[in-house]
Design a protein with these regions (language model features):
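Consensus positions within tandem repeat domains that build extended binding/scaffold surfaces
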Residues: 85-87, 107-110, 130-133, 153-156, ...
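Bacterial signal peptide processing site
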Residues: 22-24
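Lipid-handling modules and contact-site tethers
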Residues: 224
Length: 580
């Protein structure tokens, strides 16, 4: 046992040797010059020797009582290359720090909450400033950054409320989330000739964003980066030529009426135009290589989006909840439709998937308005909820290479009656396995001639019964056909569910039942005309039809009162009922 303990102690000494520059054994060493002696006297800091790199890391304040802290270039002829995480966290004595020329990185929280720190001078060797490195240094007025710095991580200078200006070197490639967040006095930021990758809220709550004299027609640029758009800007946003980066959240919640992106732009950041509900169309130039997550999320008026094949990086949620979107495409360089890309795009009735798409991500097309989907043979994976709640979906193919259908992939696709299965996956009528793909089937591989488009209506025939499945037109006022091929038909469940165009409808004589969810969430429906042949109105047939005010019934009040109306149809019951 004693030998084991001794071995562990020996290993600890070899790989993590902590020393204090002022220790007696070090003072006993022969010094050959006054410079070395002075350096030794100054270096009361706590250090750790890095055996692998033959260098030292500063790990703490040690015995130092200096207000003007100087971190030496080296110790014991080995360079000091790093300041460790939390090394000087909360050291209230420090008023300034000058960091030695060999230090390459400053760790997380290294100088966080140093309340008296006014000046920080970093050498050219520093390439990275860690998360919260100077977080909440309220007295910090001046920071000198070296010429080789590559990255300033999240919240590095957050809440440095006295900092008025900062020069970001040409070498800087990335600023993390909230890097200068709540630097209330920061009014001047200079940058080099290239755009800097930016996280979220980098300069939020700074004086720079409030100084409107630096804005150009409601737009603030930082070098080649579009940093911010005034939320009150209502005219067209024409991004100036030469801009290469649109920063995260740059135009979030704006009222801009149109958008023009120049061919110099290479990247559109996270949520850049999210919730900008005045944009109706967007054309992305072929200079753009990256579109980050949620870039156009919840742009409720956006109808068309044209994406170039130059896009190679495409985030999740890009068009989520763009409820007016009717046309979009997938760039050919992508082999995946990322998760939630078109989730909630309730006007999107079709999309072309290029050969090369392998994966349909989770919720990628959930709550769209597809009637038919054709998947290319390249598709191998349908992730969870990929087509969930496509109430209009009637027909889809499962290509030969598909090996996975995720859970609930087709759940709530109540009208999915036609599945052409070329894969090795087993699909059963009424089955809930493999993403519920077979749950609402009446038969496998519907034969030709049983699913027929007649005019603007789609019909399906099964066991001698004709069903009206869906309306494929765009008219706001619709009259259903009297018959199908001269024969009677029934309305299938969810016939018009979630229609965004329907305002008036006339149901012909002979229809006996208004089925479940027939007009569910038809929020524009104001008036309906029903025949006296209707005897049943099923559950949620008029659920969320909030605009419905008038029901014309071609029969007597007694006939209307005899209809079996499910109690979930209160909006129908409370409308004005007009009888003969």
């Amino acid at each position: 046992m004693k030998k084991a303990i001794a071995l562990i102690l020996a290993l600890l000494l070899c790989f993590s040797l902590f020393i204090s520059c002022g220790k007696k054994e070090e003072e006993a060493e022969t010094q050959e010059s006054d410079t070395e002696t002075e350096a030794s006297d100054e270096c009361a800091l706590e250090l750790r020797k890095e055996i692998a790199t033959s260098s030292y890391t500063v790990t703490g304040i040690g015995k130092s009582t200096d207000a003007e802290l100087v971190i030496p270039d080296s110790y014991n002829d080995l360079p000091i290359t790093k300041i460790d995480d939390k090394a000087f966290w909360g050291c209230s004595q420090i008023t300034s720090v000058k960091i030695g020329k060999n230090v390459e990185s400053i760790g997380a929280n290294a100088f966080a909450e140093c309340s008296a720190l006014k000046r920080a001078e970093l050498p050219d060797a520093v390439m990275k400033i860690g998360e919260r490195a100077f977080f909440s240094c309220p007295s910090l007025e001046s920071v000198t950054l070296g010429s080789k710095i590559r990255k300033i991580e999240a919240s590095a200078f957050e809440k440095c409320k006295a900092l008025k200006s900062v020069a970001l070197p040409e070498s800087l490639a990335a600023l993390g989330n909230s890097a200068f967040f709540e630097c209330e006095s920061l009014e001047s930021v200079t940058v080099g000739d290239k755009a800097i990758e930016m996280g979220i809220s980098v300069f939020d709550k700074t004086a720079m964003l409030k100084a409107k004299d630096k804005w150009e027609n409601g737009v603030l640029y930082l070098g080649k980066t579009l940093l911010k758009v005034d939320t009150e800007k209502t005219d067209e946003l024409v991004i100036k030529d030469g801009t290469t980066l649109i920063a995260p959240f740059a135009a979030v919640d704006t009222k801009i009426s149109a958008l023009t992106i120049p061919s110099s732009v290479e990247k559109i950041g996270n949520s850049a135009f999210a919730n900008s509900d005045g944009i109706t169309a967007v054309t992305i130039p072929d200079s753009v290589k990256t579109i980050d997550a949620s870039a156009f999320a919840s742009c409720s008026a956006l109808k068309t989006a044209t994406l170039p094949d130059s896009v190679r990086s495409f985030g999740s949620h890009v068009f989520i909840h763009c409820t007016a979107l009717t046309s979009a495409n997938i760039p050919k360089a992508l082999n995946e439709v990322p998760q939630h890309t078109f989730n909630g795009c309730s006007s999107l009735k079709s999309i072309e998937l290029h050969p090369g798409i392998r994966t349909i991500g989770a919720y990628a097309f959930s709550r769209c308005a597809f009637t038919q989907v054709t998947l290319p043979d390249s598709v191998t994976t349908l992730e969870t909820h990929a087509f969930h709640s496509n109430y209009s979906l009637i027909s889809i193919n499962i290509p030969k290479n598909v090996s996975k259908i995720g859970t609930y992939c087709f759940d709530h696709c109540y009208k999915l009656v036609d599945v052409k299965n070329a894969s090795g996956i087993s699909i059963t009528v009424g089955g809930t396995e493999n993403g519920h793909v077979g749950r609402f089937l009446k038969e496998l591989n519907v034969p030709e001639g049983k699913l027929v488009k007649e005019g603007d209506f789609l019909f399906y025939t099964f066991e001698g019964v004709n069903y009206l499945m869906s309306y494929l037109g765009e008219s706001a006022s619709v009259t259903l056909p009297d018959s199908y091929k001269g024969e009677a038909y029934e309305m299938y469940r969810d016939t018009f569910s979630s229609s965004r165009t329907l305002t008036q409808i006339t149901v012909p004589n002979g229809i006996k039942k208004i089925p479940t969810n027939a007009f569910k969430e038809c929020k524009g429906l104001t008036e309906i005309t029903l025949p006296n042949t209707v005897t049943t109105i099923d559950a949620n047939a008029f659920n969320a039809c909030t605009a419905l005010v008038k029901v014309n019934f071609n029969g007597t009040k007694a006939e209307f009162d005899a209809i079996k109306i499910n109690s979930t149809n209160s909006l129908f019951i409370n409308a004005e009922i007009i009888t003969n």
